[in-house]
Amino acid sequence: MPRSLKKGPFVDDHLLAKVDVQNEKGTKQVIKTWSRRSTIIPDFIGHTFAVHDGRKHVPVFVSDSMVGHKLGEFAPTRTFKGHIKDDRKAKRR
């Protein structure tokens, strides 16, 4: 179920504060964050976030098409190695 419109999008306060400081200074440094649950808002456009995937920080450059999504959607946590090909020679042995 989506979040109520009267509540507005959820963004961690510390993350919003870091973006506001960079917007005031006019800098675009990478912002390291563990907040995968934060919603991307229009203030984030043009910034690069290093989103934690459980092991390392994945750089995510925010564009206008990402607004409304969560930061965690762009940093996958699982690595898909592919399905094992059906090997008939190995089955005979």
UniProtKB/Swiss-Prot annotation:
Transmembrane segments: none annotated. The keyword Nucleotide-binding does not apply. Belongs to the universal ribosomal protein uS19 family. InterPro entries: Ribosomal_uS19 (IPR002222), Ribosomal_uS19_bac-type (IPR005732), Ribosomal_uS19_CS (IPR020934), Ribosomal_uS19_SF (IPR023575). One of its GO terms (biological process) is translation. This is Small ribosomal subunit protein uS19. One of its GO terms (cellular component) is small ribosomal subunit. Protein S19 forms a complex with S13 that binds strongly to the 16S ribosomal RNA. The keyword rRNA-binding applies.
